[in-house]
């Protein structure tokens, strides 16, 4: 087997292979490997790949495997003769057809989402996620087709999120105006009942740092929120997700509390539990305590009272410079 050294100026990798006719198993193994890499056949036994990071080594492995089966193998570093040939090479790797077929399947699946239970929704998301991941892996030159597919995939996941978490707020674009805390004293605050991470943390923050005399209304239907109540953590609420910030983080920024080290770190924990992100060590423990308390306690008032002590302790922990 002949192999040329890597060159930073080389744009393409060409693998030429001739396997013995008797090596049917090796031939099938080689073909599967070439297909998985996303190489394109210029003709029988001649396969082209762009010389991009991460592609040379697996192509070299296929070449070595073919040579071990008494195949004749040449791995070459080549360049396009001119811009036209470069464009022709790139066109060989256009994945528009694959994306179009995947989007047709996704569109068909979306039409059935409302009739699916939670388990089926998750299965559908995983199946189509694997589909787009497989195309992404071999899409070396993303274009408008890939952008359309990514947009449709985001919309599809958003539709599933709405079905899995009815009432959950969705981030909207916009700035977070600074609020005067003196104008928010002794107010009634409202959010969805059956408190979970973001809502219970918001209620604690309101009572502890914003409005000590706040009263809370736990809504069965957010459409019944009184006009004079300050809604939080639902779509259309006064305080809800903005951009990539969850409601707790929006409250911090609104009332100038985001410079508090302990609250900022607590916000990171709430964020990862609510929408994901960089792991926070304390997150899983808080989630477990909250889940147990919600099962054990009779209502949201009792839940806020008890979990408030936990959040007090976490705030102290996050504020302390000492690490135990």
Curated annotation (Swiss-Prot):
Organism superkingdom: Bacteria
Protein name per the record: Protein ChrB
GO aspect biological process, one term: response to chromate
Induction / repression: By chromate; induction increases when cells are grown in the presence of high sulfate concentrations (3 mM SO4(2-)).
Keywords: Chromate resistance, Plasmid
Chain's role: Together with ChrA1, this protein reduces chromate accumulation and is essential for chromate resistance, possibly as a regulatory protein.
Taxonomic classification: Bacteria, Pseudomonadati, Pseudomonadota, Betaproteobacteria, Burkholderiales
Short name of any one Pfam family annotated for the protein: ChrB_N
InterPro entries xref list: ChrB_C, ChrB_N
